[in-house]
């Protein structure tokens, strides 16, 4: 998207923080990121590298994580970052920040998933089941018990403000089908309803030294529409690169909804899944090309609206309908 990462990272602030915390800093290297200034910190002593995530003006993502992650871990969602230091350890600092041990970054974590499917499919299936179980635990959190989590009112405000211009661009296109306009009306009504679940994860993963995965990038952490966390996690299964994702989807559902996928969950999951397809199409009009060919997005959305098997949604998304 145009304008991404064009800000100047706050390297001076980063160096000030890490030198206050460590006496053996060797270097501070910026890692491009959307919602914060992220830096890799290395040391002259040879200790393991650290990652500093530093808040940027106008974006409370780091402030929210500092408050929320310890509470989420204490409530059974241990798949979020564990902090070594936060801004609470430097009361005089003007910045919101947290410091963690360096873990395997998202591109390599994604590659590990693809290798796992190629080399050890039973383990990949178990990982998909873990994704489902983790999703169930996240969605079961009460936003009121998670410090700094977005309230239902805040979630509605953010979703409405974000999606309105993109869907306005979509339905303004002369080639926008009637069924898409009707679906957009459903989405607009859906995001105006008080959210009854918890979520806000953006889909990024890190991999720990023991091979486990951690969920990072929570741009809208807090109260969330039903099944929105599940739809994001389901899409992550595409990173296994399976031509037929059926066993992965079955394992995911088994972890997420052990009693089976009832009609209410299916309808909410499908609405969020198709909302992602058409919402991204609208975003492409806003940020990239207002004359973009939306035929493939329309075809995918139409297919998934008429299909009750989530594995079929993933097959089509992977190019294997």
PLM regions: where:
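Juxta-kinase regulatory segment immediately upstream of eukaryotic protein kinase catalytic domains
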Residues: 1-28
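Active-site acidic catalytic loop and adjacent metal/ATP-binding pocket
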Residues: 34-47, 184-228
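A conserved alpha-helical element in kinase catalytic cores
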Residues: 50-96, 116-130
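Short pocket-lining segment of the protein kinase catalytic domain that shapes the ATP-binding cleft
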Residues: 69, 98-107
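Conserved kinase catalytic-core helix
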Residues: 109-148
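Active-site catalytic-loop/activation-segment of kinase and kinase-like phosphoryl-transfer enzymes
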Residues: 136-137, 147-190
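Active-site activation/catalytic loop segments of kinase-like enzymes and analogous catalytic loops
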Residues: 227-261, 274-292, 300
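Helical subdomain adjoining the active site within ATP-dependent kinase catalytic cores
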Residues: 265, 282-321
């Amino acid at each position: 998207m145009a304008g991404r990462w064009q800000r100047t990272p706050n390297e001076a602030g980063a160096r000030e923080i890490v030198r206050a915390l460590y006496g053996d800093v060797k270097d501070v290297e910026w890692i491009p990121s959307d919602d914060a200034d992220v830096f890799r910190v290395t040391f002259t002593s040879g200790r393991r590298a650290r990652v500093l995530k530093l808040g940027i003006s106008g974006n409370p993502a780091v402030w929210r994580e500092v408050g929320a992650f310890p509470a989420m871990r204490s409530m059974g969602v241990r798949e979020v970052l564990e902090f070594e230091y936060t801004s609470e350890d430097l009361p005089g600092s003007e910045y919101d920040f947290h410091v963690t041990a360096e873990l395997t970054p998202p591109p390599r974590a994604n590659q590990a998933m693809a290798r796992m499917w190629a080399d050890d499919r039973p383990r990949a299936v178990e990982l998909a089941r873990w994704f489902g179980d983790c999703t169930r635990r996240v969605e079961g959190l009460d936003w009121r018990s998670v410090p700094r989590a977005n309230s239902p009112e805040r979630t509605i405000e953010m979703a409405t403000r974000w999606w309105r211009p993109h869907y306005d661009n979509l339905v303004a296109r002369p080639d926008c089908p009637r069924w898409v306009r009707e679906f957009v009306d459903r989405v607009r009504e859906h995001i105006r309803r008080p959210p009854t679940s918890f979520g806000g994860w953006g889909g990024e993963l890190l991999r720990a030294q023991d091979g486990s995965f951690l969920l990072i990038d929570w741009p809208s952490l807090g109260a969330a529409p039903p099944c929105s966390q599940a739809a994001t996690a389901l899409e992550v299964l595409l990173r296994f690169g399976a031509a037929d994702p059926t066993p992965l989807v079955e394992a995911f559902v088994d972890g997420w909804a052990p009693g089976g996928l009832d009609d209410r969950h299916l309808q909410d999951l499908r609405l969020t899944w198709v909302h992602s397809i058409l919402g991204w199409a609208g975003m492409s009009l806003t940020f990239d090309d207002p004359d973009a060919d939306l035929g493939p997005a329309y075809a995918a959305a139409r297919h998934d609206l008429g299909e009750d098997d989530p594995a079929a949604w993933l097959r089509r998304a992977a190019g294997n309908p």
